[in-house]
Amino acid sequence: MYDYEELLNRAMSKMPDTETTDARFVIPEPKLFSEGKTTILDNFGNIADTLNRDPDHLMKYLTRELGTAGKIEGTRAVFQGRFTRAQLSDNIQAYVDEYVMCSECGRPDTQLVRVDRVLVLKCSACGAHRPVKKRKVSNVVVREAIEEGGTYELRIDAVGSKGDGIAKIDKYTVFVPGATKGDVVKVKIKKISGNLAFSERA
């Protein structure tokens, strides 16, 4: 029987060397828009490439943490339901903390390997390694979909009787003055009353 360290060393010896980079690691800002009752993460492929992770692994994580179903369509990810940029950003950052960043040197030059049925994060920069935790409950703080004073990018789904554009975010109906159906607008939430939100152009 091999011990854990020997199994890890054997696995590492069979993997190609990965060059480290001194370039600043920047996670792309999620580019979201809504289509009907779904949320589209338009630059999902770019995010997965930046993280150097399998898109399917990232997608499974996000759908589990968001508590929804989803699928990958080309370079986009489609999620059932309405989600905000803040919700996606929080979950992507949590994924990076657990599955990408080295806890010893803080660099993203890592690889996921499986050693004796244990998923291990191995750092190519400093050589550190740690088992990846299996989390049953998300540690991401759940936010309200929108908040007063917050700025959001919305797609206008309809126009109300008073001429205001109407968008839906989660349980909220957002009114946007001067917007027309199909517009993608950036707005600031002025007031929330129950499930109604009133905004102005940001």
Swiss-Prot record:
Keyword Coiled coil belongs to the record: no
Residue span(s) of domain TRAM: 145-202
Keyword RNA-binding assigned: no
Keywords: Initiation factor, Protein biosynthesis
InterPro entries: IF2/IF5, NA-bd_OB-fold, TIF2_bsu_arc, TRAM_dom, Transl_init_fac_IF2/IF5_dom, Transl_init_fac_IF2/IF5_N, Transl_init_fac_IF2/IF5_Zn-bd
Example of a GO MF term: translation initiation factor activity
Top-rank taxon, per record: Archaea
Pfam families: eIF-5_eIF-2B, TRAM
The protein's role, per its UniProt record: eIF-2 functions in the early steps of protein synthesis by forming a ternary complex with GTP and initiator tRNA.
Family to which the UniProt record says this protein belongs: Belongs to the eIF-2-beta/eIF-5 family.
Assembly information from the UniProt record: Heterotrimer composed of an alpha, a beta and a gamma chain.
Protein name: Translation initiation factor 2 subunit beta
Organism of this sequence: Methanosarcina mazei (strain ATCC BAA-159 / DSM 3647 / Goe1 / Go1 / JCM 11833 / OCM 88)
Gene name for this UniProt entry: eif2b
